[in-house]
Amino acid sequence: MLLTGPSGAGKSRLAERLSSAHGWPVVRLDDFYREHDDPHLPRSPIGIPDWDHEDSWHADAAVEALRRLVDDGRVEVPVYDIGASAITGRQVLTAGPHDYVLAEGLFAGRLVEPLRAQGLLADALCVRQNRFLTAARRFTRDLAERRKPPHILVRRGLALLRDEPRVVAEAQAHGARCIHPRQAESELAGLPARALPSAR
């Protein structure tokens, strides 16, 4: 189950609530970002890692982790610290045979095609709200988590506010359907248990 959408739209909170209610594992796609010393990590015009660039993360590794979690019921994934721009540890995620796996992140929509090709995709949702509310929540979150210095957060936040319509349109182009977090929570809460996949 892919949850994509603009930064700050409520993807992580939605995933946490669903996980708490149903026991579904959550794969944070942010944990697959490249580290600060990776020569392939794109840079923004203001000199910091460009977390909003499609090449800023390891998409293939994320797909492989999701496949292992669904097929094997267990996978080890990295733990990434945005503030440090580095992997700070590892964690093991487990899934029951009938669990849905929630994969949330800005670029989740880019996984629609490869996951569908492997028979792993249940649905893809683009979580969105009023973009000014999203911008305010994003700034509050990033400031509280000390992700970057305040002046950088302001500049990045304004850029993301302007760019949000493109982000949403791109998610839709990949096949994600737009939905408010509350509506998504209501819909997903009523899902039947996941059917066991056929042999691939």
Labelled PLM ranges:
Residues 3:
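Hydrophobic anchor at the beta1->P-loop junction of P-loop NTPases
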Residues 11:
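Conserved lysine of the Walker
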Residues 96-97, 140, 159-200:
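NTP-dependent small-molecule kinase module
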Residues 88-147:
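ATP-dependent NMP and nucleoside kinases share a basic, alpha-helical "lid"
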Residues 25-26, 34, 39-85:
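Conserved nucleotide-sensing/catalytic segment adjacent to the nucleotide-binding pocket
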Residues 7:
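The conserved Walker
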